[in-house]
């Protein structure tokens, strides 16, 4: 499996139950580094070839640019930016910032980073779930999400979006906590 023998990756395994997934999310809430959650329902990933990155209107979404660019550069994976289908321009602006980052890193390092922008069918509130639902269509090996900043009433009653994605996903899910002091990936 791709994650074995890698000291840089925080890997959490749990069963697919809501309680088990929520326990992992609560346990990892303060981490400054990205972490990967794997359940028994997920297929084994031997190589990263395609990474789905759902992009919503939230300003924290751009934190994922550095992570997906790093992974793509190191593994040669193709990045799929799944842009939320919103009426406003915020998701489009976030995708633009992510593309700018991808191009800048590609130019600076002299590597070719492959990416594409796909318009989601759902809006910002449901784009993460759409990524989980369409992972087979995209032949994805990883879903990259930003964790919830604060849990609102809906999250407390029904569970945060990332929990639902992890429960539905058939591939590992990498989460990034939205923190100003987010750990920076370096070579």
Named regions from a protein language model:
Residues 61-111:
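Redox- and metal-dependent alpha/beta enzyme cores, enriched for Fe-S-associated oxidoreductases
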Residues 53-55, 97-100, 162-163:
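Short, hinge-like loop/turn segments at secondary-structure boundaries
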Residues 15-16, 59, 85-90, 120-122:
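Short histidine/acidic/glycine/proline-rich micro-motifs that form metal-
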Residues 1-26, 30, 109-143, 148-153, ...:
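Structural beta-alpha unit
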Residues 3, 8-69, 73-74, 80-82, ...:
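Intrinsically disordered or low-complexity boundary/linker segments at protein termini
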Residues 53-54, 86-88, 116-117, 147-148:
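A short, structure-level motif marking secondary-structure boundaries and short turns
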Residues 31-34, 93-98, 125-129:
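Short acidic/polar alpha-helix capping motifs at helix-coil junctions
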Residues 59-62, 96, 121-125, 156:
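Conserved phosphate-coordination/catalytic loops
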